[in-house]
Amino acid sequence: MSNTPIELKGSSFTLSVVHLHEAEPKVIHQALEDKIAQAPAFLKHAPVVLNVSALEDPVNWSAMHKAVSATGLRVIGVSGCKDAQLKAEIEKMGLPILTEGKEKSPRPAPAPQAPAQNTTPVTKTRLIDTPVRSGQRIYAPQCDLIVTSHVSAGAELIADGNIHVYGMMRGRALAGASGDRETQIFCTNLMAELVSIAGEYWLSDQIPAEFYGKAARLQLVENALTVQPLN
């Protein structure tokens, strides 16, 4: 046991940043509601940072904060604030002003090229063939996600479709993020912190012991999460 009641350690977390391009709270509220409806398992009750650097018109910050919070998102800080008065209002509400890393200047867009003839159809799968490390979040919108390497604890895989992990799975896997209850999770070594299909989830201690560390397939049966051997 430590001799001190607390211990400070550096750490890193992956957070979504909502860039506000409109100063009207009602417009922001509706836009966020629409976005959350597209991927409720991914965004519902998610912690977010609000970036206000693009706001040109004055904003009622109290109303804006209420509009965002009413969607279920949890505002944990604000970035991109250069206006002294707005900064004072934000800090008065107890929210920290955060500094984001410097963004690289965008490279000039390449000259447009004529479309190639006889192009092959796009495959609805996102493939990751490198290890997914702690703090990384990978999202595969409207498709399946395949990872051919290990997924570390603290990493997060999210897909609107199925998730396949052909390595040790220690992180979090959320399939069917947009609500598709027919999606499944396939792991060759199931040691996940959390598994979820369309919002139905298990934490690591809820995974049946006989499947922990084994090849497994997870799916919903009668709206309940189930697991079986992966043959």
From Swiss-Prot:
UniProt keyword list: Cell cycle, Cell division, Septation
Any Pfam family the entry gives: MinC_C
Function: Cell division inhibitor that blocks the formation of polar Z ring septums. Rapidly oscillates between the poles of the cell to destabilize FtsZ filaments that have formed before they mature into polar Z rings. Prevents FtsZ polymerization.
Presence of the UniProt keyword Cytoplasm in the record: no
Recorded family membership: Belongs to the MinC family.
Organism listed in the record: Escherichia coli O81 (strain ED1a)
PANTHER family: SEPTUM SITE-DETERMINING PROTEIN MINC
Subunit text: Interacts with MinD and FtsZ.
Keyword Cell cycle: yes
Protein name per Swiss-Prot or TrEMBL: Probable septum site-determining protein MinC
Gene Ontology biological process: cell morphogenesis; division septum assembly; regulation of cell division; regulation of cell septum assembly
Location of region: Disordered: 100-125
